[in-house]
Structure formats: C-alpha cells, structure tokens
C-alpha cells in the first residue's frame, strides 16, 4: 500500500474525507482542531455545515473563525487576475470586521447539539486600534452564546505585516495590551500569530520579536494565550536552539498562561524533516504535554483530504509521542482550554448583557 494511503487507513481517514473508521470498529476521535479558517483572504470559503460533514466521527470539535484581513483586488496591480491569497498580489490588505458576523450566523444555523462541536473565535478587529477591545465586547453582546476566543490574529508575519493598511501592528502597542486585558477579563482564549524572528536573519542577530513577545505574555498572566506555530512561519525558520527557547518559557511560572499550537502544513517540515528534529520536538512535548495543541490551519478545506493534510504531515511526531501525550496534544488539551473558555465567557455575558 502506498505510504500516504497507509497513513490515512491507520487513522480511519478515507478518500472522501476525515470520516469514519470501518463499520466493524468503534469510531475514535483522531483530533480536535484548534486552528481552522472557515474563509480565505477574499472572504470566500465553506459553511459550518460543510465542516460538520467533513468532521464525521474522527474530529470531535473544532474552532471556527475567518481571516480578519481582506486582500484588495486592484486593477492597476493584477488587472483581470483576481487574487485570492496574500501572495497573489502586491495590493494591500485591510481589516474586514464583517467576518465576525458571518461566523456567528454560520454557527447559529446549526442545531443546539451541532453547536456543541464548535468553538467560534472573534477575529475582525485591528490590533493597533485602541477601540479593538470595544469591538470584541460589542460582538459578544450582539451574539451572546457564540464566541469563546479571539484569533487567529496577527502581529508580525513575514509577507503579511507590511501589506496591512493603515500599517503593521506592533507588540509594543498599547492597543494590543487593551485587547489582551479584555480577553483575560472575559475569559476568551487568544490565538496569536507572531513570528519569533524575521525572514532570513543574520547568523549573529537575536530573534527580532522574542523578547517583545515574552514581555507581552508576562503583562497578561490571566489571559490564556496560544502562540500559533511555535513562532515559525512560511519563511521564518526556527531560531537557534528553538526547542530550548520554548522549554525555558514553559518552565518559567511567569508563562504559566502560555500554550503553543502545532499547526500549518508549510511549517511541518521544521518539526519532521529528520529523525533529529522529530526527537527534539517529541522530547519537548513529552516534557510539557499539557501545553501543546494540534491545529490544521486549514483554510476553507474543500474536502476531508485537504483538511487531513497537516495532520498527516506530522505523522512522524505522533509516532514518536507516547499514547498519553499524543492524546493530550490532539484532543485533551483542546477540551480543557475551550471548555473553560466556554464557561467563563458565558458567565461574563450573563453579567454584562447588551445595554
């Protein structure tokens, strides 16, 4: 059997999608998805019901959020060629707040039982705007009973940050502190993309954004923060001694509120490119098994195979982890964080109804 097909078979994934294990076996949860985009950079995508169909029995729960940035289509830049991704055009990106209403309406289109499988997130705010926290509270009051977190939103991201209008966000901006303080007060989980370093750094330079990110996390000890992709990106490679840098944070009580997601197909190579990188990643996760979550970072997956790609790419890592640790990363840690957020946010909403 082809290696790819063998892997899909062993996790009960069939060509039609992340579906059900064979009928003669008991269905089992393969993963919960801490990082799923329902829409793309031009606000097109799939419905919540489409996601539910793809989940089958193999995916128990998933986050649900759009992308807060809209790629402009400028005739002077690409003519009749409509860009659908930020790499398709030099035209700017701008913040698109309607994404939150769209996600809320998708969630509300489901039955009460179906809603239990989703954990929607607010993304449609500008993190450099001091009114961003007001937007978050307004969305919660407008759509009570829906949202449980904020993100994925971006501060520093390789090709993206410089395209955003009116300008790039910053870890030093008081608006970000306002957003994170609000999230902590309300009980929202935060999923934040922030590259630890710049693309193609010099060999002697320190990671450009590591110390700033540490300072942000220290300032908000009551806010649950998931650092997306462990701070790496498409062309942002792991920093020197990357695993040791993460370990130093996870053993520091000042970062007890910090978690990392293992996500995005384009960064899987950094974790599984060799037996050595697999061993290093597995050793780190085994040491701190409660601090990592799996996320696909799939963008409006058209079918189950597209959704399963990231999970499959991390196959060597799953094989290297103990069954207990693997289950925590794939399933258990998600449940713990988002169950708590669901309780806390619903309590905040009850105490702060719409005026």
Q: Across the structure, where does each feature detected by a protein language model lie?
A:
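Mid-to-C-terminal alpha-helical segments outside catalytic/metal-binding sites
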Residues: 2-7, 24-34, 43, 47-62, ...
